[in-house]
Swiss-Prot record:
Record text on cofactor binding: Binds 1 [4Fe-4S] cluster. The cluster is coordinated with 3 cysteines and an exchangeable S-adenosyl-L-methionine.
Cofactor(s) the record lists: [4Fe-4S] cluster
Name the UniProt record assigns to this protein: Dual-specificity RNA methyltransferase RlmN
Compartments where found: Cytoplasm
Keyword flag Metal-binding: yes
Record's keyword terms, sorted: 4Fe-4S, Cytoplasm, Disulfide bond, Iron, Iron-sulfur, Metal-binding, Methyltransferase, rRNA processing, S-adenosyl-L-methionine, Transferase, tRNA processing
Its biological purpose: Specifically methylates position 2 of adenine 2503 in 23S rRNA and position 2 of adenine 37 in tRNAs. m2A2503 modification seems to play a crucial role in the proofreading step occurring at the peptidyl transferase center and thus would serve to optimize ribosomal fidelity.
Species for this entry: Sorangium cellulosum (strain So ce56) (Polyangium cellulosum (strain So ce56))
PROSITE patterns documented for this protein: RADICAL_SAM
Length: 389
């Protein structure tokens, strides 16, 4: 049971209907309030001009207002923007906007192979044929916790451990704010739960935020364009599949093909070893023609040997997957580092020859520490991780 009432930004239309009906408001006002917040991105009750004054006063009294405040925006040379956001209790998180131009002669690069199915770009092709300017599609990477409890050896987010979970209003609020900060010609196309924190460790808030972001009366993101990445919390993977019918795109932070290596890199593997994780993936109710994304961070001298690639190919045999190779991005809190390019290419070649769709993720925003594994709790004191034995 919840110990505190739902924040207004976290309420779904049916919850607004119940609370406003109890106040004697007309039935249609619930839809209006939800649309003001989640379709228009307006959080100031005074600006909700089609609502009665008494209702605007009530919303203000309930605490409707900004849930996070942008403190700094770091812009990378490649156009990536990392936003440092201040929460109401003073804690900070980070979210990242990754623009990608699509059109003739350009590379549609969506970080993290963003939303599983990118086969519906006929509108872009038609615009190009008509002579329209290429659109700038944006993927937003959002956080679900202040810090992280998973302790992965190649990731900066957990260097100071978990401080607290984010509320659904703070998770969805990142997208509301990110959408408001889009630049001319940009459109938000994909949201990836790959920022600070383990989304499924904060399951209730993550699931509620998914419902908010995909609700037809709000932003109305297609579930195909929303990806949840997990380090492998097996019961919650099953729960996500059951609650959303497998419609939410799933990404698995795997990073090793044997339990010994994976447990050294990712402590969660000691609780949910590979056989449990693979069983959960086989049971995930994946729609036809959809695949699970396997994220594999290549760490020099740890998991980047071609023999490891062959083990990975064998491990994943029979699963509907695509593989995203991520050369480790340097972080201050770790002595681990990325492999040489030749090593990455050799690893990819093994997987490609084994019949897998395998891509190497292009670095985005690493010059402003916005790349994969670099989002970090502000003020965290690093505990240096040594190379694994």
């Amino acid at each position: 049971m919840r110990s505190t009432p739902l924040h207004p930004v976290a309420r779904l239309p049916e919850e607004w209907s119940a609370s406003l009906a109890a106040r004697g408001e007309r039935s249609f006002t619930a839809k209006q309030v939800f649309q003001w917040i989640h379709r228009r991105g307006v959080l100031d009750p005074a600006a909700m001009t089609n609502l009665p004054a008494r209702l605007r006063e009530h919303l203000a009294a309930e605490g409707l207002g900004e849930v996070l405040t942008p403190e700094r925006v770091h812009r990378s040379e490649d156009g990536t923007r990392k936003l440092l956001l201040r929460l109401r209790d003073g804690a900070t998180i980070e979210t990242v906007l990754l623009p990608s131009v699509s059109g003739p002669g350009s590379q549609a690069q969506l970080d993290a192979d963003a939303a599983a199915a990118l086969d519906d770009d006929e509108d872009d092709d038609a615009a190009a044929e008509a002579g329209a300017a290429p659109r700038v599609r944006v993927t937003q990477c959002i956080s679900t916790q202040v810090g992280c409890a998973m302790g992965c050896g190649f990731c900066a987010s957990g260097v100071a451990g978990l401080k607290r979970h984010l509320g659904a209003e703070e998770i969805a609020g990142q997208v509301l704010l990110g959408r408001a900060m889009l630049e001319e010609g940009e459109e938000l196309r994909n949201v990836v739960y790959m920022g600070m924190g383990e989304p499924l460790h904060n399951y209730e808030a993550t699931a509620r935020s998914l419902r908010l972001l995909t609700h037809p009366e709000g932003i109305n993101l297609s579930t195909r364009r929303v990806t949840v990445s997990t380090s492998g919390l097996v019961p919650e993977i099953a729960r996500l599949g059951a609650d959303f019918g497998g419609q939410i795109a799933l990404a698995i932070s795997l990073h090793a093909a044997d339990d010994e290596t994976r447990s050294a890199l990712m402590p969660i593997n000691r609780k949910h070893p590979l056989d449990e994780l693979l069983a959960a993936l086989r049971a995930y109710p994946l729609p036809r023609r959809r695949r699970i994304t396997i994220e594999y961070t290549l760490v020099a001298g740890q998991n980047d040997d071609p023999a490891e690639a062959r083990r990975l190919a064998k491990l994943l045999r029979g699963l509907p997957v695509k593989i995203n190779l991520i050369p480790m991005n340097p972080i201050e809190a770790s002595s681990l580092g990325p492999p040489a390019q030749e090593r990455v290419a050799a690893f990819q070649e093994v997987l490609t020859q084994a019949g897998y769709s395998c891509f190497v993720r292009r670095r985005r925003g690493d010059d402003v520490s916005a790349a994969c594994g670099q989002l970090v709790l502000l003020g965290a004191k690093p505990k240096v991780r040594r190379a694994l034995g």
